[in-house]
């Protein structure tokens, strides 16, 4: 089963002026190997328009051709059969499967490479919207945001607010305001993920506390 070299068969005919011989040469071609992708069996990429070449090799092959799964083709992606070059369209996310088929003796032999295309992270959206207002005073307010396809969101506070004694918890968006702080505070949410990070701001107007009413004539008068 493992023989893959040259065999020579010699026929010898006995008789007058013999023997007479002739030979027959048999070339035993090795069995084609299973293709192996240079990128391995799987890979991950971010959603976006791009061309990626998926090369495979195989022992004793007379040539390798490549195909792409039907769902990927249906979404507008294409493949060059001779090279394994896949052209991804901008809107595609999901799984693409490239199949390499190696021609040769006892072939073809095939192998697949699966690509997970991760969607682009969305722009964060604050639960409170783009802006809000509050009255001056010491308290803590949490400003949360969500983003599609995000692997995590972190929060930061503008430099002026930090200098004014206010603080923020970067993992939660919880802002602790100093009692004396007035003016604008800007909370920035940064969403991690494919083709990210993506950011959005929430602006808080911190209004002055209204002062006590004072009569021009004082607290009391006589008439």
Region roles according to the model:
Residues 58-64, 121, 147-153, 210:
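Short proline/glycine-enriched turn/loop motifs at strand-loop junctions of beta-rich domains
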Residues 49-58, 138-147, 223:
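A short beta-strand segment in extracellular, disulfide-stabilized domains
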Residues 1-3, 84-93, 173-182:
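Extracellular/luminal low-complexity segments enriched in Ser/Thr/Pro
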Residues 24-30, 114-119, 202-208:
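Interdomain boundary/hinge segments at the C-termini of tandem beta-sandwich modules
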Residues 31-40, 120-129, 208-217:
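Proline-enriched interdomain boundary motifs that mark the N-terminal boundary
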Residues 14-21, 103-111, 192-199:
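Short, exposed coil/turn segments at beta-strand boundaries within extracellular/luminal domains
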Residues 5-14, 94-104, 183-193:
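A short beta-strand micro-motif common to beta-rich folds, especially ectodomain repeats
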Residues 47, 65-86, 134-136, 154-172:
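Low-complexity "stalk/linker" and mucin-like segments enriched in Ser/Thr/Pro/Ala/Gly
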């Amino acid at each position: 089963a493992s023989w893959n070299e040259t065999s020579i068969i010699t026929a010898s005919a006995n008789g007058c002026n013999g023997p007479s011989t002739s030979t027959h040469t048999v070339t035993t071609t090795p069995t084609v190997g299973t293709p192996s992708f240079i990128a391995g069996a799987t890979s991950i990429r971010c959603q976006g328009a791009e061309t990626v070449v998926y090369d495979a090799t195989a022992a004793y092959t007379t040539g390798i051709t490549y195909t792409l799964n039907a769902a990927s083709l249906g979404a507008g992606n294409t493949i060059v059969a001779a090279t394994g070059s896949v052209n991804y369209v901008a809107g595609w996310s999901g799984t693409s499967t490239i199949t390499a088929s190696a021609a040769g003796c006892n072939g073809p032999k095939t192998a697949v490479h699966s690509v997970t295309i991760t969607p682009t992270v969305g722009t964060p959206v604050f639960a409170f919207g783009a802006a809000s207002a509050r009255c001056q005073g010491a308290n803590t307010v949490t400003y949360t945001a969500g983003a599609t396809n995000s692997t995590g969101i972190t929060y930061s506070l503008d430099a002026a607010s930090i200098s004014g004694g206010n603080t923020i918890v970067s993992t939660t968006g919880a802002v602790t305001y100093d009692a004396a702080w007035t003016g604008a505070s800007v909370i920035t949410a940064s969403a991690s993920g494919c083709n990210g990070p993506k950011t959005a701001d929430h602006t808080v107007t911190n209004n002055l506390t209204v002062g006590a009413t004072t009569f021009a004539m004082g607290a009391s008068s006589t008439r």
